[in-house]
């Protein structure tokens, strides 16, 4: 029937989630969902940080799972071969692929469009910021700042370690008169958090038009008028300088961007870089220092690092 879809499930490790998501985005995938047991474990250990807990989530296996959704067409088998080969090759890049098993199932459209939402509940990710899906209710505490988010199927929910570390760093370094640039804005979560934490002006950029659309929609949900979202890369579409540039991407992209990013940061400003697997942390630090950045602090959570550096 015309509402049937093919679901490709990749059983992997938390470390490989972003890499495998990237593999799927290189194909004709229509949606991606991620089930990370580390997110569920984080929530179980921090019961005061969130509003609701579904006990059935404790039954989720230790294995992380990435699911991609496809319409069955002539290219599907080609996509599947590419996925299997790419997942198998992750070890060559020093990424633990875990089980690395790839399975295919038939699913109904309604199942994959909505089932992922049961894993996404209001979560406190910093001293002030609570990420709340737009379909959930939440009783706000006096000191809390609520970020309304509908990530859709294509973007993270804001509970990943890398996002949490970025938000905590933004909370520490943002002042009311500051300008923030967000590289690879995705759902817009960091741009929105920056604005709600008091940034005067925020510019988010992303190469993906789907991300640009998602960011703009989420900004509307939060009733903000001081965020500008642009399609393209920072060097080509943004003018001027920021007090803070934040990039939650991957180590290789951060290393590539470092020299160019320097020209977009005000003297005394900060570069908050995350999405860095711990095994690549020293490579990023070395590049930052070679480029003239001073390392302000290094945050670590799980297998990930967030490096805050400064231009004097």
Curated annotation (Swiss-Prot):
Its main location: cytoplasm. Its EC number is 2.1.1.-. S-adenosyl-L-methionine binds at residues 163, 184, 206, 248. InterPro entries: Ribosomal_L11_MeTrfase_PrmA, Ribosomal_PrmA_MeTrfase, SAM-dependent_MTases_sf. It is an enzyme of class 2 (transferase). One of its GO terms (biological process) is methylation. It is found in: Cytoplasm. The keyword Phosphoprotein does not apply. GO terms for molecular function: protein-lysine N-methyltransferase activity. It catalyses: L-lysyl-[protein] + 3 S-adenosyl-L-methionine = N(6),N(6),N(6)-trimethyl-L-lysyl-[protein] + 3 S-adenosyl-L-homocysteine + 3 H(+). GO terms for cellular component: cytoplasm. The keyword Methyltransferase applies. Keywords: Cytoplasm, Methyltransferase, S-adenosyl-L-methionine, Transferase. Methylates ribosomal protein L11. Belongs to the methyltransferase superfamily. PrmA family. This is Ribosomal protein L11 methyltransferase. The lineage of its organism: Bacteria, Bacillati, Bacillota, Clostridia, Eubacteriales. The gene is prmA.
